[in-house]
Amino acid sequence: MAAVSLSVSTVKPLGDRVFVKISESEEKTAGGILLPDTAKEKPQVGEVVQVGPGKSNDDGSRQAPEVGIGDKVLYSKYAGTDIKLGSDEYVLLSEKDILAVVG
């Protein structure tokens, strides 16, 4: 089996899926206490880096995605599939798991 080299540019989401770079989680509490990895909350915010062509409708047409590359999004806490590429973490989500576009 041949090895596959993955990078952000080689990941092409299918259908209504969206590839999101996860924002860094907080390293400290508001009071300045350092958090161990096991105590950190799973981030729910990230930046869209790839977007699929959209959801297929019953008539064969595509519904264009509501988000685009560069949008900062808020998504469901346990949604999607986590993927690590190099030192960066990503999540592959269905568009329905995105709750809002933020700031």
Curated annotation (Swiss-Prot):
Pfam families: Cpn10
Gene Ontology CC terms: cytoplasm
SMART domains linked: Cpn10
A Gene Ontology biological process term: chaperone cofactor-dependent protein refolding
One MF annotation (Gene Ontology) recorded for this entry: protein folding chaperone
Presence of the UniProt keyword Lyase in the record: no
Keywords of this entry: Chaperone, Cytoplasm
PROSITE patterns: CHAPERONINS_CPN10
Gene3D superfamilies assigned to the protein according to its UniProt record, in alphabetical order: GroES chaperonin (2.30.33.40)
Domain of life according to the entry: Bacteria
Subcellular location: Cytoplasm
Cited function: Together with the chaperonin GroEL, plays an essential role in assisting protein folding. The GroEL-GroES system forms a nano-cage that allows encapsulation of the non-native substrate proteins and provides a physical environment optimized to promote and accelerate protein folding. GroES binds to the apical surface of the GroEL ring, thereby capping the opening of the GroEL channel.
Self-association and partners: Heptamer of 7 subunits arranged in a ring. Interacts with the chaperonin GroEL.
Family according to the record: Belongs to the GroES chaperonin family.
Cited NCBIfam families: PRK00364.1-6 (NF001530), PRK00364.2-2 (NF001531), PRK00364.2-4 (NF001533), PRK00364.2-5 (NF001534)
Protein name as annotated: Co-chaperonin GroES
Organism: Synechococcus sp. (strain CC9311)
